Amino acid sequence: QNLPQSYIELVVVADHRMFMKYNSDLNTIRTRVHEIVNFINEFYRSLNIRVSLTDLEIWSDQDFITVQSSAKNTLHSFGEWRKSVLLNRKRHDNAQLLTAIVLDDYTLGLAYLNSMCHPRNSVGLIQDHSPINLLMGVTMAHELGHNLGMEHDGKDCLRGASLCIMRPGLTPGRSYEFSDASMRYYQKFLDQYKPQCILNKP
């Protein structure tokens, strides 16, 4: 597939519960997020997408939105905050909120569909559900996938020996890839929405 070279300038925000969970150690959180983004880049290479961590913001004093166990409400608040505050402060294409709260209904992440480059909706919410960076990378790559137009694969989807990243639930495994269906969804998103913000070089 001839997918264009795209660049996602990503901001990750770690909430106050994350700060407390990691004993107020900024370096631990930083290292973790960098490793997560490294995995995301490995997954997205097949789609010709480069993800760069433009900024990592850690809410060390307090949360700037109300983080609650309702994923829907928290995602909505985060989108509003991104549009009104974060976008004015730093140019970026997408923001992901990393929270240590336990989300309702066994939710590990939530994101808007077809929303990359949208001022309010180019966001995702990720629960810090596993100490394993690979699995966190899969979760964030999955939510970013929704932002890029990808719907869920079947629950048993495999690509060769790898588990498909857009499976509805997270199955622990050793290797993960985007399915052909995910690539087609992304191509369709590019054709329909023409997301200018990821087509420019950072």
Curated annotation (Swiss-Prot):
Residues 6-202 form the Peptidase M12B domain. It comes from Crotalus ruber ruber (Red diamond rattlesnake). GO terms for molecular function: metal ion binding; metalloendopeptidase activity; toxin activity. One of its GO terms (cellular component) is plasma membrane. CDD domains: ZnMc_adamalysin_II_like (cd04269). It comes from the Eukaryota. Its cofactor is Zn(2+). SUPFAM superfamilies: Metalloproteases ('zincins'), catalytic domain. This is Snake venom metalloproteinase HT-2. Belongs to the venom metalloproteinase (M12B) family. P-I subfamily. Disulfide bonds join C117-C197, C157-C164. The keyword Metal-binding applies. Pfam families: Reprolysin. This protein is a zinc protease from snake venom that induces hemorrhage. Keywords: Calcium, Disulfide bond, Hemorrhagic toxin, Hemostasis impairing toxin, Hydrolase, Metal-binding, Metalloprotease, Protease, Pyrrolidone carboxylic acid, Secreted, Toxin, Zinc. Its EC number is 3.4.24.48.
